[in-house]
C-alpha cells in the first residue's frame, strides 16, 4: 500500500513539475518575442522539443497516475491506442529534436574552413523541414502501437495479453516481441550515437579554439570562466542528462517488451524514467541558455 502511494506521489510530482517547466520555457520565448529579441534558428527546434516533452508527460503521467490510484478501466480500447501512440510519438520527437539540436550546434560552431562550411550557410534554412520530417518519421515508426495495444475492458482474458497498467498488449510471441523491441529501440540508439558524436565534435572544436586564443585569456584577470568553458558546459549538461535518462528508459522498455507480464514495479519505474528527460529538459535548457539572463536584465531595466 505504501509503495503505491509513493508511486502516485512521484508520478504526480513529475508530471506537474514537467508541465510547469514546459510552460515556463514557452513563456520565456513569448517574453523574448515581446521585448523584440530575434530568435535563433535553434529556437525552433527547442519549441518542438517543448511540445514533444509536454505530449510525453501528459500521455504517460496522467494514465499511469490513474492506474496507480487503481481507477479501473480509465481508458477504453481507442483511448489506449491513442495515448500509447501519442506517447511514443512524443518520446521519439523528443529524442529526434535533441539529436537535431546537437547536430545543428556542431554545424554552427564549426569554422568556415571545415568540411561543414557549405552546411553552415544552408542549415538554418532547413531547420523547419528537418523538424517536420522528424515528426513524420516518428508517426510512421510507431504506427505499430495502435495495432498492438488495446484496453482491458475489451479483453478480459489477461493470460493471453501483456499487462500495461490500464491497458494491455496483444499476443505473447517471444520472437515478435523481440523484433518489436529492436525496431522501436533502433531510432533511439541511432539518435544517441549521433548525439554523442556531435557533442564530442563540439567539445573538440571549442577546445582547439580556446588553445588558439590562450594568450588573450592569460591577459584577462577576470575570475569568470572562459566562453569556451561555458559553451562546453551548455553542451555537455543537456546531452549527459538525455543520454543517462534515455539509456535507462530504453533498457526498461526492452525488459517490458521481453517479459510476458511485467510487475507493477517495473511498469512504474519505466513510466518514471520515460518522463525523466521531458521533466528535466525545460530547466536544463533554461539554465544553459544565456537569453534567460538577458531577459531578466531587460525586465529589471
Curated annotation (Swiss-Prot):
InterPro entries: GPCR_Rhodpsn_7TM, Vmron_rcpt_1. CDD domains: 7tm_V1R_pheromone. Its main location: membrane. Gene3D superfamilies: Rhodopsin 7-helix transmembrane proteins. GO terms for molecular function: pheromone receptor activity. It is found in: Cell membrane. Belongs to the G-protein coupled receptor 1 family. Putative pheromone receptor. This is Vomeronasal type-1 receptor 4. It comes from Pongo pygmaeus (Bornean orangutan).
Amino acid at each position: 500500500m505504501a509503495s503505491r502511494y509513493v508511486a502516485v506521489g512521484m508520478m504526480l510530482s513529475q508530471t506537474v513539475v514537467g508541465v510547469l517547466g514546459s510552460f515556463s520555457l514557452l513563456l520565456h520565448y513569448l517574453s523574448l518575442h515581446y521585448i523584440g529579441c530575434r530568435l535563433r534558428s535553434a529556437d525552433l527546434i527547442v519549441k518542438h522539443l517543448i511540445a514533444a516533452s509536454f505530449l510525453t508527460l501528459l500521455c504517460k503521467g496522467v494514465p499511469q497516475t490513474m492506474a496507480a490510484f487503481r481507477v479501473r478501466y480509465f481508458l477504453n480500447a481507442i483511448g489506449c491506442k491513442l495515448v500509447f501512440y501519442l506517447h511514443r510519438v512524443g518520446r521519439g520527437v523528443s529524442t529526434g529534436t535533441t539529436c537535431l539540436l546537437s547536430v545543428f550546434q556542431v554545424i554552427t560552431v564549426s569554422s568556415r574552413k571545415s568540411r561543414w562550411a557549405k552546411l553552415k550557410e544552408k542549415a538554418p534554412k532547413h531547420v523547419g523541414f528537418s523538424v517536420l520530417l522528424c515528426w513524420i518519421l516518428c508517426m510512421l515508426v510507431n504506427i505499430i502501437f495502435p495495432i498492438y495495444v488495446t484496453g482491458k475492458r475489451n479483453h478480459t482474458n489477461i493470460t493471453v495479453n501483456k499487462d500495461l497498467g490500464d491497458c494491455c498488449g496483444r499476443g505473447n510471441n517471444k520472437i515478435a516481441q523481440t523484433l518489436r523491441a529492436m525496431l522501436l529501440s533502433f531510432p533511439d540508439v541511432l539518435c544517441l550515437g549521433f548525439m554523442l558524436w556531435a557533442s564530442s565534435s563540439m567539445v573538440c572544436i571549442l577546445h582547439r579554439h580556446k588553445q588558439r586564443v590562450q594568450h588573450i585569456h592569460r591577459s584577462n584577470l577576470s575570475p569568470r570562466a572562459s566562453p569556451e568553458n561555458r559553451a562546453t558546459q551548455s553542451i555537455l549538461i543537456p546531452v549527459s542528462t538525455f543520454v543517462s535518462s534515455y539509456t535507462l528508459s530504453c533498457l526498461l522498455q526492452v525488459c517490458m517488451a521481453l517479459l510476458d507480464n511485467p510487475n507493477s514495479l517495473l511498469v512504474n519505474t519505466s513510466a518514471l524514467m520515460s518522463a525523466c528527460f521531458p521533466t528535466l529538459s525545460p530547466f536544463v535548457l533554461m539554465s544553459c541558455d544565456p537569453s534567460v539572463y538577458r531577459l531578466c536584465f531587460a525586465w529589471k531595466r
